[in-house]
Amino acid sequence: MAFATYEERASVHASPVASKLLRIMASKKTNLCASLDVRTTAELLSLVDQVGPYICLLKTHVDILDDFSMEGTVKPLKELAAKYNFLIFEDRKFADIGNTVKLQYSSGVYKIVQWADITNAHGVTGSGIVKGLKEAAQENSDEPRGLLMLAELSSKGSLAHGEYTTGTVEIAKTDKQFVFGFIAQRGMGGRDEGFDWLIMTPGVGLDDKGDALGQQYRTVDDVVSTGSDIIIVGRGLFGKGRDPTAESRRYRDAGWDAYLKRCNAASN
């Protein structure tokens, strides 16, 4: 059973956040994560209202927002997440020592741990980063929180490959309940050791091949067939001249079709 269904995985997953996310994916029939990098709260909330019915996960970079506030941004964002049944992933990419990331996660302007179901981290500083972030989650949130490790990136010339990727996977193994997956371009293994990593893949496009700043796009079928569970799509949903509702529906359908193909191939 190389590729179990989302429902099967949800029922036995070690991570409460992963189980919740997998259940949402199964019930909404979507493996689409919308990445909405805009500069105002009004733009963000408007886009979320359009794509919300079609996504399982919203990926944010709140430090891009010129007008971020807990009351004006986070509160309505959480309300939309409840309305449309999706989780929130703040793409913070923590990359410091344990004590520092603990404070970055819990404190400051953004207080990420209070509202983001999921965040992520680089493995460059070692396993202390996982410990620091988990402590912040335990001390500052009554809701379950989960961490993704950045194993691979979609940008041209990325150094996240080879020994770095292998080392990052080893760091992820230090906490099975808190670390539940990776940002990666393919499956990261681990099933023979009892790990069920969720793989989220950026750089997915149905139309575009790349941009002038080094982004490289792969097709939905390609990333799902090689082990990705969630496709992360940004400008493909709301870029110039695009209808966010229509595009999110199109990517949702493409992602779900690719998932069904993977399940069928595994059962044959």
Swiss-Prot record:
Enzyme kind, highest EC tier: lyase
Residues forming the catalytic site: K93
Alphabetized InterPro entries for the sequence: Aldolase_TIM, OMPdecase, OMPdecase_AS, OMPdeCOase_dom, RibuloseP-bd_barrel
Top-rank lineage group of the source organism: Eukaryota
Residues where substrate binds: 37, 59-61, 91-100, 217, 235
Keywords: Decarboxylase, Lyase, Pyrimidine biosynthesis
Catalytic activity: orotidine 5'-phosphate + H(+) = UMP + CO2
EC number: 4.1.1.23
Single Gene Ontology MF annotation: orotidine-5'-phosphate decarboxylase activity
Pathways involved: Pyrimidine metabolism; UMP biosynthesis via de novo pathway; UMP from orotate: step 2/2
GO terms for biological process, alphabetical: 'de novo' pyrimidine nucleobase biosynthetic process; 'de novo' UMP biosynthetic process
The keyword Lyase is annotated on this UniProt entry: yes
Family matches, as SMART domains: OMPdecase
GO CC list: cytosol
Stated family: Belongs to the OMP decarboxylase family.
NCBIfam families: pyrF
Protein name, UniProt field: Orotidine 5'-phosphate decarboxylase
Protein species of origin: Maudiozyma exigua
